[in-house]
Amino acid sequence: MLIRAFIPAHITAFFVPVFHEEPLKAGSLGAGVNLSKGTNVFASIETGTLERHIHVAFNGEPVKREEAEITYYVAEKLVPKDFLGEVEVWQYFDFPNGYGFGNSAGGALGTALALSYAFGGTWLRAAQLAHEAEVKHKGGLGDVIGQLAGGIEVRIKPGGPGIGVTDNLFFEDYKVLVVPLGRLSTREVLDGDVVKAIEVEGRKALEELLKEPKPERMMVLARNFAEKTGLLPGELSEIARELDKVLKNPSSMIMLGKGLFALVRDEEAEKAKQLLSDMNLPYDIAEIYTERPKVGRWVG
């Protein structure tokens, strides 16, 4: 049996981490956007061996347990202890790991949905397990519930699926421009001194967005958040200022990754692509993904 799940890449615009000793009560407030590109997870289940084996691969390359703690945590919970056979989980990412696109959550949620589909379970239980794995292993706090929401989402009550509450912004004709330049460790940022500034500025941004719930306002608030928290490094700030010259809405920093994102329409996208090409910078453009994640039997 081969099961496939697709989870959209998720970019956080601004956030407030909310920690709690119970994983499902931990989460984040904030806002973000889901992309039409993301993580594809294939789960192959074959019976007939004398033992229970679980294997994980990223982009076609097998990985050790310590390199895929979150995925193995999910798989160990969902593959029955008395199952005799081979379970292979293959994760393919459209964006690099560690760049702020919610890959760890995408892998966790995709694995949870695929294995729940195969062995029995529900959407909510699968999503809660993925969130639990993310929180326990410090992969992230709000990506799973954000990916479930689709579109341009706003996290208005913290917590995992079934506890946290999300809303969505209306939008028209926007695509997402991304400029992925490098890695940034969520674990290091959330353990650092910058957390207090994030909490203060993130709550301000959320309050302002709820007063004027529009994508354009979200981008202004996201840029302010990135600058006032000190998260936006000089290199990204310079690129953002150049993009400002050709975009109607400000670009902002991908939270948390060394990169930028912007909401663009077709005419602006062409100008931005030309600018970034002239600057010899990588970029990509994706649609906004408005559905929930997908899962089902794969027939190729």
From Swiss-Prot:
Keywords: ATP-binding, Coenzyme A biosynthesis, Kinase, Nucleotide-binding, Transferase
Catalytic activities: (R)-pantoate + ATP = (R)-4-phosphopantoate + ADP + H(+)
Regulation: Moderately stimulated in the presence of potassium cations. Inhibited by increasing concentrations of pantoate. Activity is not affected by CoA/acetyl-CoA.
Effect of D143A: Loss of activity
Mutagenesis or variant effect for S104A: Loss of activity
Organism superkingdom: Archaea
Effect on the protein upon substituting H131A: Does not affect kinetics toward ATP but significantly decreases affinity for pantoate
Effect on the protein upon substituting R155A: Decreases affinities for both ATP and pantoate
Record-level Gene Ontology MF annotations: ATP binding; kinase activity
Activity's thermal dependence: Optimum temperature is 80 degrees Celsius.
pH dependence: Optimum pH is 7.5.
EC number(s) stated in the UniProt entry for this protein: 2.7.1.169
Xref: SUPFAM superfamilies: Ribosomal protein S5 domain 2-like
Coiled coil (UniProt feature): none
UniProt entry tagged with the keyword Transport: no
Matching NCBIfam families: panto_kin_Thplsm
Assembly and oligomerization: Homodimer.
Family statement: Belongs to the GHMP kinase family. PoK subfamily.
Protein's job: Phosphorylates (R)-pantoate to form (R)-4-phosphopantoate in the CoA biosynthesis pathway. Displays broad nucleotide specificity and utilizes ATP, GTP, UTP, and CTP with comparable catalytic efficiencies.
HAMAP family the record matches: Pantoate_kinase (MF_02223)
Protein name per UniProt: Pantoate kinase
